[in-house]
Amino acid sequence: MATNFLMHEKIWFDKFKYDDAERRFYEQMNGPVTAGSRQENGASVILRDIARARENIQKSLAGSSGPGASSGPGGDHSDLIVRIASLEVENQNLRGVVQDLQQAISKLEVRLSTLEKSSPTHRATAPQTQHVSPMRQVEPPAKKGATPAEDDEDNDIDLFGSDEEEEDKEAARLREERLRQYAEKKAKKPTLVAKSSILLDVKPWDDETDMAQLETCVRSIQLDGLVWGASKLVPVGYGIRKLQIQCVVEDDKVGTDLLEEEITKFEEHVQSVDIAAFNKI
């Protein structure tokens, strides 16, 4: 019966319930809560939690010190102490936040007051619009009839003049002169010639071929844009040696096909011609 009665109780035995009910009542009476009051309410809630925790600790200590009480585990008390310490730290942090907010609000109030003092008391009046009358079309003055003497004077004036014609001729002459000088300068400028360095392998028929005579035959080829370079004999095998000769050619004048064709004309000494290396200069 006692348990059923406590389930439907309409009074509070704990003080914090009464405090919460009283706080909600006054908040409803005073209207919406500002940001600063919310911070203070949060701090007060933490303070009430701390007080409640202390009250519970005191009750537990009082119950454990009684005659029939048994010694409980020490871990519960340590947890409560840790929670109290954390709540106190949070309380200090909230107090610091509240102080910072109060300082910021005071600074804003000071700045607002200075701005209000520096601003002009009267508003700038809008400029009055002036009534503009519609534009009237101005008629040009009537031309007077020109006298014969004035007509003669007008005829004597050369509006275009011969000076402008002379200036046009001078400008055309200068333009032609500059174009001619530019063309001469461009013609004198040396043009870049694309050249290539080629290393040829000239192979004889057998080891009895006179390699000196073969080199003489190859160097006897004279073409526009062809310059022969160094040469040497490279052994191939079985006593046979090939002629390795270097040359520089102009790409527009001498091609590799033409060079091979001219060398292979010496059929008695030359078996074949191969390009060992080809580099652009």
Swiss-Prot record:
InterPro entries: eEF-1beta-like_sf (IPR036219), EF-1_beta_acid_region_euk (IPR018940), EF1B_bsu/dsu (IPR049720), EF1B_bsu/dsu_GNE (IPR014038), Transl_elong_EF1B/ribsomal_bS6 (IPR014717), Transl_elong_EF1B_B/D_CS (IPR001326)
Modified residues (N6-succinyllysine): K117
GO cellular component: cytoplasm; cytosol; endoplasmic reticulum; eukaryotic translation elongation factor 1 complex; glutamatergic synapse; nucleus; synapse
Modification N-acetylalanine, positions: A2
Region (Leucine-zipper): 80-115
SS bond list: none
Leader sequence segment: none
Assembly behavior: EF-1 is composed of 4 subunits: alpha, beta, delta isoform 1, and gamma. Isoform 2 interacts with HSF1 and NFE2L2.
Similarity annotation: Belongs to the EF-1-beta/EF-1-delta family.
Name listed for the protein in its UniProt record: Elongation factor 1-delta
Species of the source: Rattus norvegicus
